[in-house]
């Protein structure tokens, strides 16, 4: 490394930025494949039940399944409207 290289800004090349973004997309897609088949239907049914009591839109309910070595966790996030 020369003296002048020390003061130059180190910019990420567009190729490395594109590679990093692609890795994020691939990881996200792999995560989607591991979800159970019943998850979309479960989300719709939960949405119907919640709508009996509160007016919400489809994007206000999120259902995810997290897995680790010993168990699976069903995570339900509902954004309730303000009154």
UniProtKB/Swiss-Prot annotation:
Disulfide bonds: none annotated. InterPro entries: MinE (IPR005527), MinE_sf (IPR036707). Keywords: Cell cycle, Cell division. It holds the Pfam family MinE. One of its GO terms (biological process) is regulation of division septum assembly. Gene3D superfamilies: Cell division topological specificity factor MinE. The keyword Cell cycle applies. SUPFAM superfamilies: Cell division protein MinE topological specificity domain. The keyword Metal-binding does not apply. Prevents the cell division inhibition by proteins MinC and MinD at internal division sites while permitting inhibition at polar sites. This ensures cell division at the proper site by restricting the formation of a division septum at the midpoint of the long axis of the cell. Belongs to the MinE family. This is Cell division topological specificity factor. The gene is minE.
């Amino acid at each position: 490394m020369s003296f002048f290289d020390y003061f130059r800004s180190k910019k990420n090349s567009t190729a490395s930025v594109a590679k990093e973004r692609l890795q994020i997309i691939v990881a996200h897609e792999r995560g989607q494949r591991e979800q159970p088949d019943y998850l979309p239907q479960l989300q719709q049914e939960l949405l119907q039940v919640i709508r009996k009591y509160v007016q919400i839109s489809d994007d206000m309910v999120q259902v995810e399944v997290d897995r680790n070595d010993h168990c699976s966790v069903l995570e339900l996030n509902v954004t309730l409207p303000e009154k």
